[in-house]
UniProtKB/Swiss-Prot annotation:
Top-level taxon of the source organism: Bacteria
Protein name: Small ribosomal subunit protein uS12
GO CC annotation: small ribosomal subunit
InterPro entries the record matches: NA-bd_OB-fold (IPR012340), Ribosomal_uS12 (IPR006032), Ribosomal_uS12_bac (IPR005679)
Function: With S4 and S5 plays an important role in translational accuracy. Interacts with and stabilizes bases of the 16S rRNA that are involved in tRNA selection in the A site and with the mRNA backbone. Located at the interface of the 30S and 50S subunits, it traverses the body of the 30S subunit contacting proteins on the other side and probably holding the rRNA structure together. The combined cluster of proteins S8, S12 and S17 appears to hold together the shoulder and platform of the 30S subunit.
Amino acid sequence: MATINQLVRKPRVKKVVKSNVPALEACPQKRGVCTRVYTTTPKKPNSALRKVCRIRLTNGFEVTSYIGGEGHNLQEHSVVLIRGGRVKDLPGVRYHTVRGALDCAGVKDRKQGRSKYGVKRPKS
């Protein structure tokens, strides 16, 4: 335990926590415009063509965001909403596009886990 005198000379320093999603600026989601929509390959040992897009956010940041689900309707100039959450096997991809919000349509014929892919409840 430090003495009062030691604390007067050199106070305790708060630890600085670095954000995993700096472009969101402490917001839950951010809006942006797609500048490029493309596929990329994951790190070893995985193999696929992952759908990603480059997005210019309203705060001026340019980030790469993953497009989850099977099939999408995004193209250049689409307005999308992004949330935090990295993709472990894609280096540099720290954000996810929100399906079913703004210009990004929900996943077609999705029956389970619908809320994560912007799909309304089907008529039974």
